[in-house]
Amino acid sequence: MRHKKSGRKFNRSASHRKAMLRNMVRSLLTYEHIRTTEPKAKELRSSCEKLITLALRNDLHSRRLAYKTLENHGLVKRLFDEIGPRYEGGGGGYTRIIKLAEPRKGDCAPMCIIELTKRAEAPAEEAAATTEAPAEEAQEA
């Protein structure tokens, strides 16, 4: 019997499951939103929130623990320098799962988007904001 066993198996071996979740965490922290199936997103949420909580502690031991999962120095740096500070003063709830209406073609699996709740400004939006500011100053003068 499988009473009180936490985590989903996804019909994969332990090493495959660990690699899959590790890759999904890397993708979520890189792109800040990904499209996946609902059970995978629910499992990914706990892994990602634990890493963001480590980023809030921001000490050497936390960086080493994060590196064990991410295995990418650039991504660890981004997690601790960019993503972590966005959530200062928050008490969890760093990710959001949005269910999609259309299931996946082929196997009709329920799909969703998992994203960070406080996403970075898109570079296109920042560029548009900076180009509008000088134009407004020229009109005032």
UniProtKB/Swiss-Prot annotation:
One of its GO terms (molecular function) is structural constituent of ribosome. Gene3D superfamilies: Ribosomal protein L17 (3.90.1030.10). One of its GO terms (biological process) is translation. Pfam families: Ribosomal_L17 (PF01196). It comes from the Bacteria. InterPro entries: Ribosomal_bL17 (IPR000456), Ribosomal_bL17_sf (IPR036373). GO terms for cellular component: cytosolic large ribosomal subunit. SUPFAM superfamilies: Prokaryotic ribosomal protein L17 (SSF64263). Keywords: Ribonucleoprotein, Ribosomal protein. PANTHER family: LARGE RIBOSOMAL SUBUNIT PROTEIN BL17M (PTHR14413:SF16), RIBOSOMAL PROTEIN L17 (PTHR14413). Belongs to the bacterial ribosomal protein bL17 family. Part of the 50S ribosomal subunit. Contacts protein L32. This is Large ribosomal subunit protein bL17. It comes from Maridesulfovibrio salexigens (strain ATCC 14822 / DSM 2638 / NCIMB 8403 / VKM B-1763). The gene is rplQ.
